[in-house]
């Protein structure tokens, strides 16, 4: 039995006090949530402290909260911030646990079957287990997740029902406990004691939960009764303290009991017989043979081990769902009355909408050619309307909310005053005729003041031509294109901030990590060419890149004024007017954001006599040296993850993959 703690409130700790229009935004959001409003939008300009506002709202409404970001990097940043704001509450991190993932696929044109290949990050797997166990044990939980939270996860009821509950004085034999641990996918390992394992020494059983990485538990028996339970350091075995109640959750999220397993296997066999009959009637003998061989092997593994590689493809049968029914996801682990916050909602909601179709197209091919049973199609992400059915109350957070969010609610709460007093930039519209010379003059003014410039173009050719022209004119310039690798991208941004070069040219400068306070000029070429990066939302986001410097200025080069341009200019002017009035009324002088310049990722290179840290030229390395570099990077990646620096860990991961591809 799980005793759920529901009496502990969220306790926000921060040296900041709400300022600007944060108090009004916080009050409005809280009042609307407590008044039962289902959906609302927090329209927060860049740099206005949206995460702090979100934290204030969570602490006041006191509901379990799911915060969804559109990629791992942003989720990692938010997780770090929420951990600082709520040190005494359960702040959890739930993203895809794959460092590398090649999904199972089949390409009929070349008759190529691509097996599923993946590398699981043990640290993230631990954090996922920590998230689900926290949700079942307590209410003061914030889970920061990527869109992987809408993928199938296994039944929360089975997960909770399978949990092993232990107390001192409880009558249970040692062997019964060992059998229960094996049933929930724990492995016995008396030598290498790690997550998801247990070891036995006489009347003492030591268990290492899947949600921990340093502390394990020691269960001491006296006959067929538990004498005491202690929390211990997993490495030294040193006792930390005694425990009154221990709940051990399964070591995998896909778990079922023996009775359900036999029922599931019977359903899998029935579906297999049906699909084999279909293939044989259509003369697809190869597909039939392939399907029989694969499925019968999986059934044998399920019978003997209770698990098989790719068990999630049978999740419909394991969960007892009907064909087409949505899978269980992280959202099902939350209680009914929970709060969802969608960060950068204009990006995240688009991802939630698109996940289902891509997944189905790939899996349908596997089903058609006999690699999987049709029920594998039900191991999938949620459709958007299925996601909506889980929503009790939701806050969309964005500087530029999308059409979907706007269609869901008329309640829009603005937050456009920055704590630093910074204003949205002034905008000039200039003709494209003579734009090169005009731009050169503007760049030279910034160089003289030791400031930087962003230039965004629409085509690769335009970017390359402009780069060549500016180089000929003596400007220190770089072009950041889509082929630039992760580490190079970080290096380019760092060099721009340090003044190694003064101008950065790109097509899409809206991605995360491109906020540079030293940038005082953003030039938008072809501003009148309507499209993804020149619509109102794209323009406002691009304009925001100049909002971190007190001298921020935007120039749009265009031959006509489009509706998108006019709306973006009007919105920026409206915000600027409000910001100026606020600063004047409160005597605030705007100041450029101060942001530390982070060092480059470096790795240790071993020489015969010493170890020196230096930047590496990977291209010129031998295969053996590259292998050493990969090992060193993997170690540093783990260290970064343990320190909760997921942005750095993600960069390490991408670099490791690039190095592996060189061989």
From Swiss-Prot:
SUPFAM superfamilies: C-terminal UvrC-binding domain of UvrB (SSF46600), P-loop containing nucleoside triphosphate hydrolases (SSF52540). It is found in: Cytoplasm. GO terms for biological process: nucleotide-excision repair; SOS response. Its main location: cytoplasm. A motif (Beta-hairpin) lies at residues 97-120. InterPro entries: Helicase/UvrB_N, Helicase_ATP-bd, Helicase_C-like, P-loop_NTPase, UVR_dom, UVR_dom_sf, UvrB, UvrB_inter. GO terms for cellular component: cytoplasm; excinuclease repair complex. It comes from the Bacteria. Residues 627-662 form the UVR domain. Residues 1-10 have a biased composition (Basic and acidic residues). NCBIfam families: PRK05298.1 (NF003673), uvrb (TIGR00631). PANTHER family: UVRABC SYSTEM PROTEIN B (PTHR24029:SF0). This is UvrABC system protein B. It comes from Streptococcus pyogenes serotype M6 (strain ATCC BAA-946 / MGAS10394). The lineage of its organism: Bacteria, Bacillati, Bacillota, Bacilli, Lactobacillales.
